[in-house]
C-alpha cells in the first residue's frame, strides 16, 4: 500500500516543474490527484498517468476557484504551487510587477485556502502545503526583491493558518527550496543577456555544486502530504543544499 493511499490531493501549477513532479509522486504513492494548471496543453500530458485527473484553473480568478471547490466533495491535501519569479531589485520592480507577483504568489494561495479550508474543517482533518522559497524571510537574495517579499508572505500565511486551526485537525506547512532545475529556471537563464554566464552564476552559489531536481523536492512533498508528518505543522521546511547556511 502506498504512503498516500486513499488521499485526495488537489494541487496547482501541476503542468511542469515541481508541481508536475509532485503530482506524479503523489499518484505513485496511491493518492487520487486532481492536478490543476492554466496551461491546458501541458496539463493534458498528465492524463495518461493512473490516479491523476486534470482541471484547467486560473488561480488568480476567485470565481473559478470557488466553482472548482464546490465540485470537490472530499479533500485531504491542498498543495499550492503556483508562482512567478520576478528578476530585479526594488528599482526594477514597477507597480504592475509588484501587483502581478503578489496576486499570483500570495493572493492565489489565500483564495485556494479560503475555498477549501471549510471542507477540511467539516471533515475535522486537512493538510495544506504551500510553496515558499529560501529567497524569503530566510535569506536575502540579490535581484529577487518582490519574489522574496511574496515568499516571506507565504511563510507568514502558513504559520497563521497553522496557528488558527491546529486544534481543529488542520495542518499547514510550506516548502522552501533553493534553486531547482525546472523549465522556469531554464527560461530565466535563457532570458538573460549572457545565458552561459547566468548559468555559471546560478551554479556558483550552490554549495553542493548542483541544482536540486524537481523530483527531490517532490519527495519532500510526499512526506508532508503523508501521515508520517502528522506532528509537523506551521513549519517552513528548507530543502536548499545548504545554500542558506
UniProtKB/Swiss-Prot annotation:
Species per Swiss-Prot/TrEMBL record: Rattus norvegicus
Residues that, per the record, bind NAD(+): 16-18, 37, 58, 151, 180-184
EC number: 1.1.1.-, 1.1.1.30, 1.1.1.104
A single BP term in Gene Ontology: siderophore biosynthetic process
Protein name stated in the entry: Dehydrogenase/reductase SDR family member 6
Record keywords: Cytoplasm, Lipid metabolism, NAD, Oxidoreductase
Family indicated by similarity: Belongs to the short-chain dehydrogenases/reductases (SDR) family.
Major enzyme class: oxidoreductase
pH dependence of function: Optimum pH is 6.5. Active from 5.5 to 9.0 with 4-oxo-L-proline.
Catalytic reactions on record: cis-4-hydroxy-L-proline + NAD(+) = 4-oxo-L-proline + NADH + H(+); (R)-3-hydroxybutanoate + NAD(+) = acetoacetate + NADH + H(+)
Any one of the GO CC terms: cytoplasm
Protein's gene: Bdh2
Function, as annotated: NAD(H)-dependent dehydrogenase/reductase with a preference for cyclic substrates. Catalyzes stereoselective conversion of 4-oxo-L-proline to cis-4-hydroxy-L-proline, likely a detoxification mechanism for ketoprolines. Mediates the formation of 2,5-dihydroxybenzoate (2,5-DHBA), a siderophore that chelates free cytoplasmic iron and associates with LCN2, thereby regulating iron transport and homeostasis while protecting cells against free radical-induced oxidative stress.
Amino acid at each position: 500500500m502506498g504512503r498516500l493511499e486513499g488521499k485526495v490531493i488537489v494541487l496547482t501549477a501541476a503542468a511542469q516543474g515541481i508541481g508536475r513532479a509532485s503530482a506524479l509522486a503523489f499518484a505513485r504513492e496511491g493518492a487520487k490527484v486532481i492536478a490543476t494548471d492554466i496551461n491546458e496543453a501541458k496539463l493534458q500530458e498528465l492524463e495518461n498517468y493512473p490516479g491523476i485527473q486534470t482541471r484547467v484553473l486560473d488561480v488568480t480568478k476567485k470565481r473559478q476557484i470557488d466553482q472548482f471547490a464546490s465540485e470537490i466533495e472530499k479533500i485531504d491535501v491542498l498543495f499550492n504551487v503556483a508562482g512567478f519569479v520576478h528578476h530585479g531589485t526594488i528599482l526594477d520592480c514597477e507597480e504592475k510587477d509588484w501587483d502581478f507577483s503578489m496576486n499570483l504568489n500570495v493572493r492565489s494561495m489565500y483564495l485556494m485556502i479560503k475555498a477549501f479550508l471549510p471542507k477540511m474543517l467539516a471533515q475535522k482533518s486537512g493538510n495544506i502545503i504551500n510553496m515558499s522559497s529560501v529567497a524569503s524571510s530566510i535569506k536575502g537574495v540579490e535581484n529577487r526583491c518582490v519574489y522574496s517579499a511574496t515568499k516571506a508572505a507565504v511563510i507568514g500565511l502558513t504559520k497563521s493558518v497553522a496557528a488558527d486551526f491546529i486544534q481543529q485537525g488542520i495542518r499547514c506547512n510550506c516548502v522552501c527550496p533553493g534553486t531547482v532545475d525546472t523549465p522556469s529556471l531554464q527560461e530565466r537563464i535563457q532570458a538573460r543577456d549572457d545565458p552561459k554566464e547566468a548559468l555559471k552564476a546560478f551554479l556558483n552559489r550552490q554549495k553542493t555544486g548542483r541544482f536540486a531536481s524537481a523530483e527531490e523536492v517532490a519527495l519532500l512533498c510526499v512526506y508532508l502530504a503523508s501521515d508520517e508528518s502528522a506532528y509537523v505543522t506551521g513549519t517552513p521546511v528548507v530543502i536548499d543544499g545548504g545554500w542558506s547556511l
